[in-house]
Amino acid sequence: MKNSIIVFLFLLTSLSFAQEVDSTFVVIDSTIVDSAEVTFDKNSIQNASAIVAFYERLYQLEQTKTGKLNVVHIGDSHIQADLFTARMRNKMQDAFGNAGFGFTFPYSVAKTNNSAPIRFTASGDFQSVRNLYADNSKPVGLSGIALETKSNNFSIQLDVKDPKYHFTSLKIITPQNTDLFDVSVSSKNTIIETKVPKRVTHKVKLGEVLGGIADKYNVSLKALKKANGLKSDMIRDGKTLTIPSKQTQPRFVTKTTFLPIDLNATLLSHNYFSDKTLDKITFIPNQNTNDFALNGLILENNSAGIIYSGIGVNGAKCADYNKFPLFFEQLPALQPDLIVISLGTNESFDKQTADQYFSQLDQMIASIKLKAPLASIVVTSPPPSVLHRKYTNTY
């Protein structure tokens, strides 16, 4: 256990990425030089006693090979990109077991970057807004991004590309835990025959006139001209004319019907448990509902081990998460044993003072403790970054 603990401590304190500030460019009129003194120490964990409870659970997991431990990593673009979190997830699951991918969200449907092992595709019209820009009328919850639609004609397909994250358990997180979605793991295709107007054409030959062509096909000259956008009777050799016709021809259309499965409603989510491992699933509208919003999905398997969930929003600050109580209300759905907060990059380019930043951070921690009192909390310092892709942040 000692070696495993040392490895985890090293990863937690040393893995940082010299990324640029968030990928969605936000113009800031100026920066403020904070008067707070910065001391550059070696990587270390301050107040390590605060995570003793987590390490005790980690020790039990290592010894008994039973149960699951949930790590939830909250942050900005470094976390949404699943770079830091993917490395941590792989290392911890290699050491303590893989219990599933954890939290995911259809970021690509919200027109932003997605986590590599998970792919989403969708049909339908969706609106999305990040917690940076959303007001409190928007259903911003666990993902930090509002994704909604008022159409009941849509589908969202989840496809897990990496076999090690195939799943047997799915949890659906929605505002107020409303039953908004049906879930399908199978579908059937029905071929439907319909009648469509038959397309008749005529290629003009040398010497033919428009009136003669109309007589040949028993249509009026006016109808023939209208069908081809002609304003005069002049036509040229070789032109292909569309001939108005009342004839029809069959057209075969394949209609896909998704077969919904029963979900189990709990206090925090709607769940599905499968006897076999799944790599894809489809979400369709509950036909008894008109407004749809999705806050997140949780994927697990039947194995003991670590579930490492990343929740990141490009450009986010502590204050952006603090604006939305729903984020904290839904946090217990992840059953967190350890919560890692990696924010501060975007604050460092803002006009916040150190006192303002720590006030927001304290508020965030207090809200987390209120909803997840048994979770240990680790706050990491921001990684190196650059402003506007060229100015090094030295503050």
Segments (PLM) and residue ranges:
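Solvent-exposed, acidic/flexible segments
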Residues: 77-85, 203, 207, 217, ...
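Second-shell loop/turn segments in exported
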Residues: 69-79, 209-213, 315-317, 347-354
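Bacterial Sec-dependent N-terminal signal peptides
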Residues: 1-30, 35, 242
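Solvent-exposed, polar/charged alpha-helical surfaces in well-ordered, non-transmembrane soluble domains
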Residues: 52, 56, 82, 86, ...
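Serine-esterase "nucleophile elbow" of acetyl-processing enzymes
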Residues: 45-125, 129-131, 162, 170-195, ...
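Short glycine- and acidic-rich boundary segments immediately preceding or forming the N-terminal edge
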Residues: 19-58
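Primarily a LysM-type cell-wall glycan-binding module
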Residues: 191-221, 231-232, 239-240
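Alpha-helical cap/lid subdomain in secreted, periplasmic
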Residues: 20, 25, 135-195, 300-307, ...
